[in-house]
Amino acid sequence: MATYTTSDFKPGLKFMQDGEPCVIVENEFVKPGKGQAFTRTRIRKLISGKVLDVNFKSGTSVEAADVMDLNLTYSYKDDAFWYFMHPETFEQYSADAKAVGDAEKWLLDQADCIVTLWNGAPITVTPPNFVELEIVDTDPGLKGDTAGTGGKPATLSTGAVVKVPLFVQIGEVIRVDTRSGEYVSRVK
């Protein structure tokens, strides 16, 4: 099995920790004035979703995680599962609610997603970075009503709620950044 040392660490690197695949969210090399150098990392366990801060002594080796990231197309959802299809082989994968997580509110039919597989089963679903959704409910923006933070909540066609500028109305299509859940722009 492949291994990584602390010099290989970078955000996005996947490795095994306590028998569970993890991904490095952020890392920092620390060389104190006295003592051994170490790498301070923030990792997210891919199955449980827990975020941990872990320090590794310089030169420590970790086992590479045997995970695959596949570009799949979201097909449909039934009572308990979301179904994704490989665009070339037409192979179907089913992901449960735990694997889909917060990505559910950004999934549109035929959207290209990155699905992470471990032992052949989906463990995480990453939606596209930007999605275009229609606003189905929001307060009307009154002219001259700029005394607040300059935003209002809007419910989108998938059920997600995002903060939008006052000029955006019901029925308009907006672009949303799925990583932060923030409004980006109106779609012409």
Swiss-Prot record:
Single GO molecular function: translation elongation factor activity
InterPro entries per UniProt: Elong-fact-P_C, NA-bd_OB-fold, Rib_uL2_dom2, Transl_elong_fac_P/YeiP, Transl_elong_KOW-like, Transl_elong_P/YeiP_cen, Transl_elong_P/YeiP_CS, Transl_elongation_fac_P
GO process annotations (BP): peptide biosynthetic process
Keywords: Cytoplasm, Elongation factor, Hydroxylation, Protein biosynthesis
GO cellular component, one term: cytoplasm
CDD domains documented for this protein: S1_EF-P_repeat_1, S1_EF-P_repeat_2
Record protein name field: Elongation factor P
PTM info: Is beta-lysylated on the epsilon-amino group of Lys-34 by the combined action of EpmA and EpmB, and then hydroxylated on the C5 position of the same residue by EpmC. Lysylation is critical for the stimulatory effect of EF-P on peptide-bond formation. The lysylation moiety would extend toward the peptidyltransferase center and stabilize the terminal 3-CCA end of the tRNA. The hydroxylation of the C5 position on Lys-34 would allow additional potential stabilizing hydrogen-bond interactions with the P-tRNA.
Residues the record lists as N6-(3,6-diaminohexanoyl)-5-hydroxylysine modifications: K34
Phylogenetic placement of the source organism: Bacteria, Pseudomonadati, Pseudomonadota, Gammaproteobacteria, Pasteurellales
Family: Belongs to the elongation factor P family.
Pathway: Protein biosynthesis; polypeptide chain elongation
Known role: Involved in peptide bond synthesis. Alleviates ribosome stalling that occurs when 3 or more consecutive Pro residues or the sequence PPG is present in a protein, possibly by augmenting the peptidyl transferase activity of the ribosome. Modification of Lys-34 is required for alleviation.
Pfam families per record: EFP, EFP_N, Elong-fact-P_C
Annotated compartments: Cytoplasm
Gene name, Swiss-Prot/TrEMBL: efp
Major location category of this protein: cytoplasm
